[in-house]
Amino acid sequence: MSRYTGPVEKLERRLGVDLFMKGERRLAGKSALLKRPYAPGQHGQRRAKVSEYGSQLREKQKAKFMYGLSEKQFRRLFKEAARREGNTGEILVQLLEQRLDNLVYRMGFATTRRFARQLVTHGHILVDGKRVDIPSYSVKVGQKIEIAEKSKNNPQILRAVELTAQTGIVAWVDVEKDKKFGIFTRKPERDEIVIPIEERFIVELYSK
């Protein structure tokens, strides 16, 4: 299954949760989910009871769509999490958070992960001084992420920095917004990562 590219606000309404996919509209309080907090369609306001499998599938979809992964990418990441020692669900979330596109977003250089992914693929991002154009690149603790010199005055990036100043920066990165760079200082603890996902359902789904 390929990465979802359809209307993101309709998707958020269908899943009934904010997936942080509409940055500027969300920050302005204009997201469709806030105005119409129910599924689209004629019977959208009557949500059917969800089965156990439905709950498991729903959590996987939320994680995939929020972080912008295809089914193949997500399954590969889950296998990597399951291979490591520790809580598989928590490790999965940490691996998602270590993706380069996600950290560009977390550092406030993009209002959405989708825009962050575009910045990476179009060559606007450097890691330790070298251009990296792979959104799934797993950033290591201590690595420096910065906007390429030619892109530092990009209007969209400047707008993102201005808007994300309202929301603050997560505790596991250290950012110099004026200089357009940040350091991934440590792996986050699960209780620090504020996302509407119950990863235990994902573990149950893939463990069948």
UniProtKB/Swiss-Prot annotation:
InterPro entries: Ribosomal_uS4 (IPR022801), Ribosomal_uS4_bac-type (IPR005709), Ribosomal_uS4_CS (IPR018079), Ribosomal_uS4_N (IPR001912), S4_RNA-bd (IPR002942), S4_RNA-bd_sf (IPR036986). GO terms for cellular component: small ribosomal subunit. One of its GO terms (biological process) is translation. Residues 98-161 form the S4 RNA-binding domain. Keywords: Ribonucleoprotein, Ribosomal protein, RNA-binding, rRNA-binding. GO terms for molecular function: rRNA binding; structural constituent of ribosome. Disulfide bonds: none annotated. Pfam families: Ribosomal_S4, S4. Transmembrane segments: none annotated. It comes from the Bacteria. One of the primary rRNA binding proteins, it binds directly to 16S rRNA where it nucleates assembly of the body of the 30S subunit. With S5 and S12 plays an important role in translational accuracy. Belongs to the universal ribosomal protein uS4 family. Part of the 30S ribosomal subunit. Contacts protein S5. The interaction surface between S4 and S5 is involved in control of translational fidelity. NCBIfam families: PRK05327.1, rpsD_bact. This is Small ribosomal subunit protein uS4. It comes from Campylobacter hominis (strain ATCC BAA-381 / DSM 21671 / CCUG 45161 / LMG 19568 / NCTC 13146 / CH001A).
